[in-house]
């Protein structure tokens, strides 16, 4: 596996020097300063590559080229935004980058309710609390029809949760959900968010799939022409939220994506922390079934709680993800590829990390502090080395 590290650009508190010292050789980044839907100029891409090269690092994976909401809703200027996306892909390929991660989540990217959940050892993790989210939907956002998405017990718990909240608590929860987490290119006020939700009225799972299929049929031929590996990121959490459909959550969704545009360039980001939230997602089976389409991996683990829809992010080698078996399955796929002459290792990044040690006293991007990810990378690296020595002695290091 190629060891990579996500970097949010010059404003990221984690520097390129930090990344280099962590042992990563590749950087996963994007041009976050360019608005959604605007073409990425070759000059801007090359400038970012030069910044990385100055520190002996390479831009391994683009994460992400955001998809404009008009494309997801198949409305407004969707055709122009698709053409812009196609040109951005051509420009990325012209600069020698071969992998692009993206997602098709409506409105919000990844979602959490608590960005500072304290663990027993004093470190802090990200958490999704189903009852807190219900309190937001039912009593803060007041989304019509939201009660249909929660059990009677959850609704009672959500009301009690809301009644115990202060104004500061309400503002914090609202901000955590709709203000935009790292990697999300858009944040909203409550009124803006309600208006955006209204744009999805009448768009169910079948319609969103149709809209994504239209996008893929326009994008994948370009990826084939220029040699790009497109790697769709799963929904996080992997289920419908806010009355919005989600269509990249299960192995059945992966099969649909493969069949919709059956090309090796139409692939996946295997995010174990996203898919792994669902107990019915067999991560190893997913890797074994779609191994040739897995172009990028995000390795982390989560811990499901008493309410199975509530979870927090665990240590990389703890929680509900069997990281040993996951890494072994990835290495098995790498060995298969190398036997066929494809020597490109699968890029991997330690996804998220606990805020811990000195980082507890610093301003950090939620989930993306340095020391927690350093720990995660070191742990995964150790698993990989042990597996290679034991089972894959001929696998190119």
From Swiss-Prot:
EC code(s) of this entry: 4.2.1.8
Cofactors named for this entry: Fe(2+); Mn(2+)
TM region(s), chain numbering: none
Any Pfam family matching the protein: UxuA
InterPro entries reported for this sequence: Man_deHydtase, Xyl_isomerase-like_sf
GO molecular function: ferrous iron binding; manganese ion binding; mannonate dehydratase activity
Pathway: Carbohydrate metabolism; pentose and glucuronate interconversion
Family: Belongs to the mannonate dehydratase family.
Protein name, entry field: Mannonate dehydratase
Organism for this UniProt entry: Yersinia pseudotuberculosis serotype O:1b (strain IP 31758)
């Amino acid at each position: 596996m190629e060891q990579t590290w996500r970097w949010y650009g010059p404003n990221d508190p984690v520097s390129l020097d930090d990344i280099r010292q962590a042992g990563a050789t590749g950087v996963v980044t994007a041009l976050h300063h360019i608005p959604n839907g605007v073409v990425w100029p070759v000059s801007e891409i090359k400038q970012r590559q030069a910044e990385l090269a100055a520190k002996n690092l390479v831009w391994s994976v683009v994460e992400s080229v955001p998809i404009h909401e008009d494309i997801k809703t198949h409305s407004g200027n969707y055709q122009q935004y698709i053409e812009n996306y196609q040109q951005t892909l051509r420009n990325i390929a012209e600069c020698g980058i071969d992998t692009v991660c993206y997602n098709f989540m409506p409105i919000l990217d990844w979602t959490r309710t608590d960005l500072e959940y304290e663990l027993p050892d004093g470190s802090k993790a990200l958490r999704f609390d189903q009852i807190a989210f219900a309190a937001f939907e039912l009593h803060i956002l007041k989304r019509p029809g939201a009660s249909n998405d929660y059990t009677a017990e959850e609704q009672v718990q959500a009301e009690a949760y809301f009644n115990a909240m202060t104004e500061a608590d309400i503002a914090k929860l609202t901000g955590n959900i709709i203000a935009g987490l790292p990697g999300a290119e858009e944040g909203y006020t409550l009124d803006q968010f309600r208006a955006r939700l209204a744009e999805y009225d009448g768009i169910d799972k079948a319609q969103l799939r149709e809209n994504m299929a239209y996008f893929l049929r326009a994008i994948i031929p370009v990826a084939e022409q220029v040699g790009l590996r497109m790697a769709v990121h799963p929904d996080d959490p992997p289920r419908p939220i806010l009355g919005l459909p989600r269509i990249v959550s299960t192995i059945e969704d992966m099969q649909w994506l493969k069949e919709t545009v059956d090309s090796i360039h139409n692939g996946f980001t295997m995010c174990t922390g996203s898919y792994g939230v669902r107990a019915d997602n067999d991560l190893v089976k997913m890797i074994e079934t779609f191994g040739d389409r897995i172009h990028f991996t995000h390795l982390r683990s989560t811990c499901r709680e008493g309410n199975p829809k509530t979870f927090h992010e665990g240590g990389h080698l703890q929680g509900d993800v069997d990281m040993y078996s996951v890494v072994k399955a990835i290495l098995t796929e790498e060995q298969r590829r190398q036997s066929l002459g494809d020597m490109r290792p699968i890029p991997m990044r330690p996804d998220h990390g606990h805020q811990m040690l000195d980082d507890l006293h610093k301003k950090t991007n939620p989930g993306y502090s340095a020391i927690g990810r350093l720990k995660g990378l070191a742990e995964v690296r150790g698993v990989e080395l042990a597996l290679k020595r034991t089972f894959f002695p001929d696998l190119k290091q």
